[in-house]
Amino acid sequence: LAVLGRIFLPTGAYSSAQPVNFGANRVSYQLGLPLSLANVRPYRETGFTSLEVLPTLTFYEDNTEPFGADRNAKDPLFSVEAHLIRNLAPGIWASADLLYRQGGEIQVDGVASGDHTRGWSAGASLAVPFTDRASAIFTYQQVVERDDDGPDGWFFRTALVVPF
């Protein structure tokens, strides 16, 4: 059990004259309580199994330069991410993944927008050695249940992980 604290700083280009921006102009703060439970086998051994759970709460500063308004505020967003992971062979592991999100309603100039979000996603990941020091991780995730304003769809992600 541990405590997680993150600060997300504004990045990228932001213009209040544009309705969509790749950048951000507000800071957000995230607190979490990561938990990991594992069987007693050594970490790298085939058959090692673990359950990792990460509940987080993200707080957002106000956007004081939004498009078409004077101020946007965003309610905190609660999420829980969980992974059941099993080592299949040296350097190869697979996981079943779940993600739950709730909250994050936006208020524009003090008026609630009604876009509170809630939804579940499920998926799987597979990691395979790429080199002696690097792994490729393939992840698929699908929204399985949501409210009208919740995220929808699926994604496939590939990541190259090189520890140092």
State the predicted function of each range.
Residues 23-65:
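Hydrophobic, aromatic-enriched interface-forming segments
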Residues 1, 40-49, 90-91, 132-133:
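Short loop/turn motifs that connect adjacent beta-strands in outer-membrane beta-barrel proteins
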